[in-house]
Design a protein with these regions (language model features):
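Conserved N-terminal structural module of periplasmic/extracytoplasmic solute-binding proteins
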Residues: 6-9, 13, 19-83, 329, ...
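Pocket-flanking alpha-helical
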Residues: 55, 69-111, 153-166, 250-257
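Helix-loop-helix "hinge/cap" segment bordering the ligand-binding cleft or interdomain interface
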Residues: 67-70, 105-197, 208-235, 305
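Hinge/lid segment of periplasmic solute-binding proteins
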Residues: 78-120, 126-129, 265-267, 274-286
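Periplasmic-binding protein-like
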Residues: 160, 164, 317-344, 348
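Extracytoplasmic/periplasmic substrate-binding proteins
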Residues: 200-307
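Short amphipathic alpha-helical coupling segments at ligand-binding clamshell hinges
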Residues: 307-320
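Conserved C-terminal helix/tail region of periplasmic/extracytoplasmic solute-binding proteins
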Residues: 338-407
Length: 407
């Protein structure tokens, strides 16, 4: 890995440091598909961002789909993070074990990964160009923390009272216009995030995967700075923002492919310096400037489901993993890079994702549902904060350490 030497989108609105070469070669292993006809009913517990995959299966196979809010009562679970509960070991079944092997899983596991997706701040390219001129997105992507935070604060003041203002991004000056562009309908710099947990990737990579207070405190202080900047300049009452923090999968489910084709990605930037890092494979500049290719979630089957429910859930999982239309549901409908390293480039935004993976990304860090929920709840404690004190920062870091199970 090459090291980098440092230093709404106007809808309800939306890179960090390791480098990756082009997409790894596709795993061409095939899976024997079940001969039995698809079952007629399937009960699914799913997140909003992954629901389109279940719906695609049901439509393709003529299955009656029931969505439930109770994970324990579902046959199949499609979750953004590793679920808890009593789940079937996918390697205990011959066909599911073959699917697991395609994802590189050969030992006991209770879920199949669904793939990865770009994560960060998403914004409409036309809005950024109207505000700053051509090349704005590229300048924002490589802006350092001081430039980024100053830009956010200046833009927020400009939105309250538009007048010409100069900001520096990646060492170049850009001027905000003296009047609000007609394409800008946002009421804040940021809209509420669709995914908070993936924002901890840079901190965890900076700590070299070491879940201790000593390794994580510095990087988590950097996350605190990023989160408070976001809260301070967020659109009120769920309003539209220029930027929205999310995975591409979240946005495709929320807005559809046509809207997403006009988006560009800016990193979720945390205030890090090299003294915060214990990792040798990353540095602060790289963790600031490269995007995250975040885990999008997993497929799991409840161990206690009925025989018919088990059959239905297995058919759905195998369809996604071994059927051409199922793979299209992952790569085109959800917009993921699959666990066996295939991806769609049929739309502007998915083609951009493929290009970015070939240029450089940060690898996502897997979190279970409990940890992800706790990290999100910890961020919400800052929502009404007006004075960012040392005590508040310490409490936030302590909350994040507890959520991550740090020692």
């Amino acid at each position: 890995m090459q090291k980098i030497k440092s230093a709404a989108l106007a809808l309800p609105a939306l890179l960090l440091a390791g480098c990756a070469a082009a997409l790894p070669a596709e795993n061409t292993a095939t899976i024997e598909t079940a001969a039995a006809a698809a079952p007629q009913t399937l009960k699914v517990y799913t997140s909003a961002s992954l629901a389109p995959a279940a719906q695609a299966y049901a439509e393709a196979q003529g299955v009656a789909l029931t969505l439930t809010d109770e994970a324990a009562s579902a046959d199949l679970l499609l979750t953004d993070h590793a679920p808890g509960g009593s789940l079937l070991d996918v390697t205990s079944d011959t066909l599911l074990a073959a699917a697991a092997a395609r994802a590189g899983i050969t030992e006991n596991a209770n879920a199949l990964p669904l793939g990865r997706s770009l994560y960060g701040y998403w914004a409409r390219a036309d809005v950024l160009n109207a505000l700053l001129g051509d090349g704005a997105a590229a300048a924002l992507q490589t802006a350092n923390w001081e430039e980024w935070s100053d830009f956010v604060e200046t833009l927020s003041a400009w939105m309250a009272e538009p007048k010409a203002a100069t900001v520096t991004l990646s060492g170049t000056d850009y001027t905000l216009p003296d009047a609000r562009p007609g394409s800008l309908t946002a009421t804040g710099v940021f809209a509420a995030p669709l995914d908070r947990a993936s924002g901890y990737t840079a901190a965890l990579l900076a700590a070299d995967g070491t879940y201790t207070a000593d390794a994580l405190t510095g990087p988590l202080n950097g996350v605190y700075s990023a989160v408070t900047l976001e809260w301070d300049h967020m659109a009120a009452d769920g309003g539209e923002g220029i930027f929205r923090r999310a995975k591409l999968t979240d946005l495709l489910a929320e807005y559809g492919a046509d809207t997403c084709n006009g988006l560009v990605l800016v990193p979720f930037k945390c205030q890090l310096d090299d003294s915060d890092l214990t990792a040798e494979d990353y540095n602060a500049e790289g963790l600031l400037n490269y995007p995250v290719l975040a885990d999008v979630g997993s497929i799991a089957i409840n161990a206690g489901t009925s025989a018919d429910g088990l059959k239905a859930a297995k058919s759905a999982a195998l369809w996604l993993y071994s059927n051409g239309a199922g793979e299209d549901a992952l790569t085109e409908t959800l917009g993921v890079v699959t666990p066996w390293n295939t991806a769609a480039g049929t739309t502007a935004v998915t083609a951009m994702q493929v290009q970015q993976v070939g240029t450089g990304i940060l690898p996502g860090v897997a979190l279970d549902t409990a940890a992800a929920d706790a990290l999100a709840a910890n961020e919400l404690t800052l929502q009404d904060s007006e004075k960012h004190t040392k005590a508040e920062r310490t409490a936030f870091v302590d909350g994040a350490l507890a959520a991550l199970g740090a020692e």
